[in-house]
């Protein structure tokens, strides 16, 4: 399934049905009076977060969503049928933005959460409403209220517990593949990952979700490389895992590049809890590994961990560190299977 995290939609709620001008006409009733019914209410446009979706690709092929109009009123005080609502089903974590792409209308973060995007127009009054002591036979009714037209943007921000950070080829996808059932594309060239990937990672009978985003480069906040569009997918993460390529000759510059892009993006991303890890230690000898760890500890203030996503060295320690940083609320505890004792 193709990944799409930003799309534009056009919506219109249904117009209300017009009121009816009608008079009671029955045998032996000479002056029946007005009996025109009201028009039906137009359909509304809703958005609902549903489970099982992780992309907005469906909205690439259909961008226009129009609710049904209400039916006009009828004689014998019959109200017209209401127009059918239309529901936009979106993934959990979808933000709905106004046409300016800045004003947030709603953030759908829970399954089943709904929001009304455009309310249907009210139906018009039939002539029964205009009867008075001075006007016993009104020939007047109201038209239905027009529907509402809007242009909106949908932006998907994946919901994960841990977000992976790093320059291209830092080993983020390798780490995700080694610790979960996710199978992102892995190759020895930059920007192998072109869209975010999610994986469920388990350690010590608990599970949490890890998000892998495309690598950042200097100037990403200005649109270089793949830009910073994908940083929105780690806004909701409880902790960030910053991976460094241990074979890089410019570790300090690499650190400042990523931190600079986080600060340029804003929304407090640079202030999130962050675990720094030196990756690919299987490709380093003892002396070079010690030197790289010393450099990173000096610039980060200590606490740098080391691992190899390919060989698996230190991966469990990193997962346990991540688990400790995540609050207990989002952690999913796996049931421990108790085996019955063997009986002859």
From Swiss-Prot:
Residues 160-327 form the OBG-type G domain. Residues 126-146 are annotated as: Disordered. GO terms for biological process: ribosome biogenesis. Residues 1-159 form the Obg domain. The keyword Magnesium applies. SUPFAM superfamilies: Obg GTP-binding protein N-terminal domain (SSF82051), P-loop containing nucleoside triphosphate hydrolases (SSF52540). Monomer. An essential GTPase which binds GTP, GDP and possibly (p)ppGpp with moderate affinity, with high nucleotide exchange rates and a fairly low GTP hydrolysis rate. Plays a role in control of the cell cycle, stress response, ribosome biogenesis and in those bacteria that undergo differentiation, in morphogenesis control. This is GTPase Obg. It comes from Roseobacter denitrificans (strain ATCC 33942 / OCh 114).
